[in-house]
Amino acid sequence: MGRLISVSFGLLVVFLSLSGTGAALNCASGWSGYDQHCYKVFDKPKSWADAEKFCKKQTSGGHLVSFHSSEETDFVVKLVSQTLESQILWMGLSKVWNQCDWGWSNGAKLKYKAWAEESYCVYFSSTKKGWRSRACRLLGHFVCKSPA
């Protein structure tokens, strides 16, 4: 009986230590899971377009990160702060060419908003609230997101 309790406790410790690392969501090694998605911070700066292409190559369904709630934003900002110091990070929001609508790089409509100002490609910071825009050609770090 004591051995069964010991083994059960050991399995519980392993499960709890893996929670939040993406293991429970079946994320690839080095990726972190939240709400049915996997996330990874990349610290090699790229232009917005190059970062989006890079994310698409990483996993099936991969794109630059899109935010759909303040809780998801908080999760990603915490993930970034564990990896990088204060940096500009691209996210998947840009002005859809020849349209007046903003859209996420994964095709989702923009519903949740946190604008600080307006322009073409959008970034966020791990230390400043709100979204900001800048020329898409400029380099920035980025976070990729994919379905779990």
Curated annotation (Swiss-Prot):
Disulfides per UniProt: 27-38, 55-144, 121-136
| GO MF term (any one) | toxin activity
The organism's superkingdom is given as Eukaryota
Q: Does the keyword Ion transport apply?
A: no
Instruction: Please name one Pfam family that this protein belongs to.
Output: Lectin_C
> Gene3D superfamilies per the record?
Mannose-Binding Protein A, subunit A
Q: Does the keyword Signal apply?
A: yes
Q: In which tissues is it expressed?
A: Expressed by the venom gland.
Q: What Gene Ontology cellular-component terms does the record carry?
A: extracellular region
Which residue intervals define the domain C-type lectin in the entry?
A: 34-145
Give the subcellular location.
Secreted
Where is this protein primarily located?
Answer: secreted
SMART domains in the record, alphabetically?
Answer: CLECT
Signal sequence residues: 1-24
- Keywords for the protein's UniProt record, in alphabetical order: Disulfide bond, Hemostasis impairing toxin, Secreted, Signal, Toxin
Quaternary structure note:
Heterodimer; disulfide-linked.
Family affiliation:
Belongs to the snaclec family.
Q: What does this protein do?
A: Interferes with one step of hemostasis (modulation of platelet aggregation, or coagulation cascade, for example).
As a miscellaneous remark, the entry gives: Shows greater sequence similarity to the beta than alpha subunits compared to other heterodimer snaclecs.
The protein's matches in PANTHER family, at most eight in alphabetical order, are given as: MANNOSE, PHOSPHOLIPASE, LECTIN RECEPTOR RELATED
Query: What is the name of the protein in this document?
Result: Snaclec B2
Q: What is the organism field in this record? A: Macrovipera lebetinus
